[in-house]
Amino acid sequence: MKCIINRRAQFSASHRYWLPELSAAENQAAFGLCAQPYGHGHNYVLYISLYGDIDDYGMVLNLSDVKHVIKKEVTGQLDYGFLNEVWPEFRETLPTTENIARVIWQRLAPHFPLVRIQLFEQPELFAEYTGNNMEALLTIGTHFSAAHRLALDSLTLEQ
């Protein structure tokens, strides 16, 4: 029988949006506060979805082993790091949520039967990557409230 299991991990890191081919004014215009010299940080939440057969012990994979690989390959390297410098992929590419999710996939794919990577930059903003080259999905959630009147036209406001 097949099953998808999910493992959650967290790390805190900072990053900066800056393209060397653009001038300082162009970077500031394109990226606003994200282009500040010292960057800015996030508390990232990572979900790794893995797919496989349930073995005789009732597991797809030993989650303790999964935890150790994630720490070795991802969170142990990124936690409290400056993403633009920690991984070489981000020296030439912006460390956007989408790109970070893609690179995490590339680093974990040799170890696991990955189905999906979800990386939350904040509760309302996350990227989802499923291993299809650069087709990452970026989702932004929002909330709104509206007042409305539920009444019959024949009733007065007081009724």
Predicted features by range, described:
Residues 1-159:
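Charge-rich, low-complexity N-terminal segments
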